């Protein structure tokens, strides 16, 4: 529950899948993930910023990736759904796919139906995403080094990744009616300056830009990296998921005393 609790504020139009009601009644809906990360970032923003952003997007980018839209600190939409397999492209997970492609993959497997489903589940969780696109480890630094040497598959993998994140942020900008703040979190979001630069560079037509010196500075902790002329503030904020769990446990323990 803690992993997606923050997403309980999403409206029905964001959580409901267009599938028969019998499956929706059994729990088939969009739950969202990285809730602890989002909660920790909202908490840090409230503590550090004099004016809390009304319209905010959090891009949690790591081995798993999600983008979440928040209005006045409450989640209104997010890219992951029933499982953490969907949404934007990830290290070993594909993100959103045509459902027909999944049926195609099942039919391509040998063995009985259970074996076929198990094989496709493994493909979708461990053999897709950047790993599948590049044909090598999905680590961003490895891919960037390969791309710099002219590896076409690595170049394509990086382009598809940044494009998927850009599309999510751009779509949520429309949904929110504008964007006051973008926050990058997660292993890639916090430590990969080139990835941040590429993603924000794709958003220049929205008046969003970052300062190269601030983006490339070897710093830790919460920091602002947007350029002075940017219409949207851009931050890098550590995802304090462990601390958030500890705070929840402490609160539960106190309530039982």
Positions of predicted regions on the chain:
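Conserved active-site and cofactor/substrate-binding residues in soluble primary-metabolism enzymes
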Residues: 33-36, 40, 65, 96-100, ...
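Conserved phosphate-binding/catalytic loops in two-lobed NTP-binding clefts
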Residues: 193, 197-241
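Glycine-rich phosphate-binding loop of actin/hexokinase-like ATP-binding domains
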Residues: 6-107
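Glycine-rich phosphate-binding loops at beta-strand->alpha-helix junctions
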Residues: 62, 180-203
């Amino acid at each position: 529950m803690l992993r997606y609790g923050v997403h309980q504020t999403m409206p029905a139009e964001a959580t409901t899948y267009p599938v028969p009601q019998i499956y929706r009644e059994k729990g088939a809906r969009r739950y969202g993930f990285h809730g602890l990360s989002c909660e920790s970032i909202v908490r840090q923003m409230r503590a550090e910023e004099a004016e809390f952003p009304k319209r905010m997007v959090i891009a949690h980018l790591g081995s798993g990736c999600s983008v979440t839209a928040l209005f006045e600190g409450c989640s209104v939409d997010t890219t992951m759904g029933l499982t953490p397999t969907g949404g934007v492209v990830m290290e070993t997970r594909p993100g959103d796919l045509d459902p027909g492609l999944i049926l195609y993959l099942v039919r391509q497997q040998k063995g009985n139906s259970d074996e076929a489903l198990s094989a496709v589940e493994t493909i979708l969780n461990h053999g897709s995403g950047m790993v599948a696109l590049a044909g090598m480890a999905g680590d961003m630094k490895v891919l960037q080094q390969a791309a710099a040497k002219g590896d076409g598959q690595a170049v394509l993998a990086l382009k598809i990744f940044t494009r998927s994140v850009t599309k999510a942020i751009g779509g949520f900008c429309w949904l929110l009616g504008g964007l006051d703040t973008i926050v990058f979190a997660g292993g890639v979001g916090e430590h990969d300056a080139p990835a941040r630069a590429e993603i924000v560079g794709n958003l220049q037509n929205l008046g969003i830009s970052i300062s190269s010196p601030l983006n490339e500075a070897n710093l830790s902790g919460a920091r602002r990296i947007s350029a002075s002329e940017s219409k949207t503030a851009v931050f890098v904020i550590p995802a304090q998921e462990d601390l958030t769990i500890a705070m929840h446990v402490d609160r539960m323990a106190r309530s039982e005393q």
